Amino acid sequence: MEIFTHLLLLSVLYMECLVGFTVNMIFLAAIFMKWKTQRSLPTCDKILSQLAISRGLYFFSVIMGNLIFHFFPWLLQNYIVLSIQYIQAMFMILISHWIAAILCVYYCVRIVTYNCALWVFLRSRISTLVPWLVAASVIVSLLSSLPLGWFGYDCKSQNISNYSAGSITGNGFVIVPNMDIWFLILILGSFPPFVIFCAANSLLIYFLLVHTKRMRNVTSQNLTSHFGALKSMSLFLVLQIMFYIFTSLSASGKFLRIKFVIPIYWIILCFFPLFHSFYLFFSSSDLRKILISKCLSFINCT
């Protein structure tokens, strides 16, 4: 019964990751088709493409990590493979936080209007700053993840071999993750982008709420667009907060000895980016129209 439950949870996790990877690759393909048609992309779509890439790689890394852990555990006896696995797992989480923060800052700067000189300067420069911000986020995420390659695990005797997150080496030791280091690196690496994201998103939601109240007597089309933006950013804020909470809980290692906790944690952690990826794709009518038209033209040609 335990084996059946474990396999069922793994099947749900792999299916969830495959769907998430596919949705983000379709989203990325739609953006590419838009660029191919128009020969240019607005900055917002460029950031969304980076978000789709980071989430696609996140789902792919979850699949590969769980495949290695459950079906090829002997690979984790190699310290190089283990270090690479730990580094890329942390990198995917941190870069997702940073890209989400950059997207929210861009929306906030472009939509919120203030007469402050710094704000006016940011509005005029934000499009040119975005590529540098993305590059900096990649570097910061990588540098923040590298310590896991050296300090992210401990070697202990086989008397704790029942530890669900460990792997036994050929020397009779069990390699277990050092959850104190995991938690410390995750908090130090993800807290700055999370604070930036929450601050920018909260400011944007407040501005949209105030602006929507002032537009009660304006045309319904403008009011509908503001309601849509308000709903989208509120959903993004809730999902990102939940993602941050559950990644922090998983990195704390408090529940690793509970049966089936690892696949359950990954199922929960993958749900938030999966749900938001679906929402982004189906709420973007332009990208859906471009993708549908390209698919129809391809079908007609064949």
Name each model-derived stretch.
Residues K46, Q50-G56, V210-Y244:
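Intracellular effector-coupling site of seven-transmembrane GPCRs
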Residues M1-T22, L186:
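Extracellular N-terminal segment of 7TM GPCRs
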Residues K34-C44, V112-L129, S202-H226, S285-T302:
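Intracellular signaling interfaces of 7-transmembrane GPCRs
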Residues S144-W150, T169-A200:
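Extracellular-loop-to-transmembrane junctions of the mid-late helices
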Residues A101-I102, I187-N217, S234:
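Class A (rhodopsin-like) GPCR signature focused on the TM5-ICL3 interface and adjacent 7TM helical core
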Residues I99, L235-I241, I245-L249, V261-T302:
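Seventh transmembrane helix
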Residues I99, R125-Q158:
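Fourth transmembrane helix
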Residues V12-L75, A100-V109, K231, V238-L239:
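Structural signature of the GPCR N-terminal helical module
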